[in-house]
Design a protein with these regions (language model features):
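Active-site loop segments of alpha/beta catalytic cores
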Residues: 1-41, 80, 89, 114-357
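Segments that shape or occlude catalytic/ligand-binding pockets
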Residues: 34-72
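A contiguous, low-structure linker/loop signature
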Residues: 69-120, 140-144
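Intrinsically disordered, low-complexity segments enriched in proline/serine/threonine
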Residues: 28, 54, 58, 66, ...
Length: 357
């Protein structure tokens, strides 16, 4: 499946993170797998071919492209992950949601078995020796290397296992079994993170959606009391090894940011409009590298190509600076007009070097 890696070199990514004057703003243009059944495939391939800055490794194949869907993104094919959570989706390529929670009834808790972090990511099996070998191959090729914890690793995972409403009720009432479950999740994640450190990756990415359209999914006080200590333990070996910590959350996380950042986060990946460009700039510009997730709700699906061009420039001027501290990522999903997709690709290419002009 064709998606971009970052347009920038390993050296430029490191310079952006460390405020050491990158040659350009690192850009990532991700094409969700659902797009290959929504758009004319040749039209998408044409756009990729026309924008080599965003897709530096793209090679057009002469055979028909067959989309590959993740286990949790196959319509009509429910998937039970290694935590026992049953996933379903209505559209091929779009990650589904958990429809059956293995501990919806906590009377089952004492019989509940965690997956083995030496053999599983939580979603599927993993061979850590193979992972280390792949990291070594990428390093030998001069590429940026990553260790990616599964998306929704702690609080969301607890919700997937127990159910969102029951999770919040349990935390409010400080139910011992749920608090124990949360601690066990932290230990599971920590075991995986130690493998990333052992493999000597450049960056450890820790993604979990904590925000909604307005405000967080969990109160700041509850996050601070129950989830933050787990985060702190998870980040400690990454900090001690001198690796880059990349933290991701969708949604409005403004009231959680200070607690999220306290663990020594080097890169924060958050959404632009729901948090506000000016707020993001005021909190992070010149201090912490922002991996800015570009709007998918208003401007890119419904704006004009001219508005999109102006918006990408505004993002870079508002949040970035000549020394670095900014990366941009855009995720393409069905529904964005092709002319807007083209405008996005062109603007991301055009303004990547804005601070070097």
């Amino acid at each position: 499946m064709y998606v971009s890696t970052s347009s920038a070199s390993r050296e430029d990514i490191l310079r952006a993170v460390r405020f050491e004057g990158p040659e350009c703003v690192p850009m990532t243009f991700h094409i969700n797998a659902a797009c290959w059944n929504h758009y004319d495939r040749n039209a998408l391939l044409d756009l990729m071919e026309e924008h080599p800055f965003l897709f530096p490794d793209f090679r057009r194949e002469q055979i028909p492209l067959v989309p590959e869907y993740d286990d949790v993104a196959r319509a009509g094919q429910p998937y039970v992950d290694d935590f026992g959570c049953k996933w379903e989706t209505a559209m091929d390529g779009i990650v589904g949601s958990v429809h059956e929670h293995p501990l919806a009834d906590m009377s089952r808790y004492r019989d509940y078995r965690f997956p083995d972090p030496e053999r599983s990511t939580g979603l599927r099996a993993i061979d850590w020796e193979e992972f280390e070998a792949e990291v070594a191959r990428q390093k030998a090729a001069g590429l940026m290397t990553y260790g990616d914890l599964r998306h929704g690793h702690t609080f969301q995972q607890l919700c997937d296992i127990r159910g969102y409403v029951d999770t919040l009720m349990d935390l409010a009432e400080e139910e011992p079994e749920t608090l124990e479950l949360l601690e066990r999740l932290g230990e599971f994640n920590l075991a995986q993170i130690r493998h990333f450190v052992k493999a000597d990756v450049d960056m450890v990415r820790i993604p979990e959606d904590l925000g909604m359209q307005n405000g967080p999914m969990i109160s700041p006080d509850m996050f601070r009391r129950f989830v933050k200590p787990i985060y702190q333990k998870m980040l400690q070996p990454v900090r001690e090894a001198g690796k880059i910590i990349h933290m991701h959350s969708d949604g409005d996380i403004r009231t959680l940011v200070e607690d999220i950042m306290e663990g020594g986060v080097d890169v924060i990946n958050l959404q632009d409009r729901v948090n506000g460009l000016e707020w993001i700039a005021g909190r992070f510009r010149g201090k912490t590298c922002v991996d800015l997730d570009i709007d998918r709700q208003k401007i890119t699906p419904f704006g004009s190509p001219q508005q999109i061009d102006a918006y990408i420039r505004r993002c870079i001027e508002t949040v970035g600076c000549k020394e670095g501290g900014l990366m941009l990522i855009y995720g393409l999903y069905p529904g964005v007009p092709l002319e807007n997709v083209k405008a996005l690709m062109a603007a991301m290419t055009r303004y990547a070097g804005l601070w070097q002009e």
